[in-house]
Design a protein with these regions (language model features):
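N-terminal cysteine/histidine-rich coordination modules
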Residues: 1-81
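Structural motif corresponding to the intra-repeat A-B loop/turn of tetratricopeptide repeats
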Residues: 136, 140-143, 147, 187
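Flexible helix-coil transition and linker loops at the boundaries of alpha-helical arrays
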Residues: 93-94, 108-124, 139, 158-170
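TPR/TPR-like (Sel1-like) alpha-helical repeat modules
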Residues: 154, 158, 190-200
Length: 200
């Protein structure tokens, strides 16, 4: 691996049982420079968010690294029937640019839809896709795409707030209420934003 901030991890894909490698960022290479109000983090050097979506090159299974190995046999069967038959083998290992990271995240999002995942899981991937478009501000169409995925994330966070038990991932009720208010603010709906912020 060319970039010494990266390293490879070997594991077994929980969907197809193939031995695969995924790329991770060394923790010492992650130096935070700033944070946005919706928890988007900026780094001085390499950005670990580019590597958080892992992909099996053999079957097309993709998920956030923290959840990648949490796949039941029933879910694995859904991957085999809903994704693998249409998958063209390709590797996402090694150094990634934003375009490749976006592709990995969108594949993870598609996997979640096939698995009929919880709203909170969908929200987590959607907001990260929005952040990647924000980081990629050199692309003239990125702002529209950012807002599109912020809106998707918002819809899923609201559904999660209404239907899931707290904590939702790492979010307690106050944090979830805050992120909903903040996302409403970012997409230009101050009335709804204030309504949610007033609950805190």
């Amino acid at each position: 691996m060319v970039n010494d901030s990266l390293y490879s991890k070997e594991l077994v894909c929980p969907a197809c049982k193939s031995k695969i490698e995924v790329t991770k960022v060394k923790s010492k290479a992650c130096v935070i420079s700033s944070k946005d109000t919706d928890f988007c983090v900026y780094y001085e050097g390499i950005n670990p968010i580019l590597y958080e979506a892992w992909v099996c090159e053999y079957c097309g299974y993709a998920a956030l690294g923290e959840r990648f190995e949490e796949l039941t046999d029933k879910q694995a069967q859904k991957i085999k029937t809903g994704i693998s038959p249409y998958w063209k083998s390709r590797s996402f290992n090694g150094e990634r640019n934003i375009d490749l990271a976006l592709e990995a995240y969108k594949l993870a999002l598609y996997n979640l839809h096939v698995l009929e995942a919880k709203s909170s899981d969908l929200a987590k991937v959607c907001i990260r896709i929005a952040w990647l478009y924000r980081i990629n501000d050199k692309d003239s169409g990125s702002k529209d795409k950012e807002n599109e995925f912020l809106n998707y994330a918002l819809q899923h966070y609201v559904k999660a707030y209404e239907s899931e038990r707290f904590p939702i991932g790492k979010f307690d009720e106050i944090t979830c209420t805050y992120i909903i208010g903040e996302l409403y603010r970012r997409i230009g709906n101050p009335e709804e934003s204030l309504k949610w912020f007033s609950k805190i």
